[in-house]
């Protein structure tokens, strides 16, 4: 199977460690995490007896083979399908810049590398770059030179970076920027 997905999980911050442990059970050892804030209006929260909370936002690369089992466990163990507990969704990935980066991001997951022979015909594409802090300017310079009108920077902390030297030959700082 040659399909990769960018997994996004948003839930309460107190669930972060449990989610990372669940990811690890499914061979997802590399992820990025950051915080967000819920936007529900005060009246809705009050009606439901809830308080405004900070959210954990986790990003990871997963394979098509990994997703069904993870999705099942997100529902069964994390109760992600219960309203108010969070959301998990996947975005198809069409390419990754470099074989070593691909191996690192899919470590411990089954993935058969295969070169795509045809490009997907899409009107828009989402380009994500994960970089050490401080490189956003050069990334955006390159993106603008290629026609991008702008971008968004998300500050995150990398997890599972211990194995980075094995694949990339360099140590990675845990503080990241997702552009």
Outline where the language-model segments fall.
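Positively charged, small/polar-rich N-terminal and surface patches that mediate targeting and assembly
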Residues: 1-179
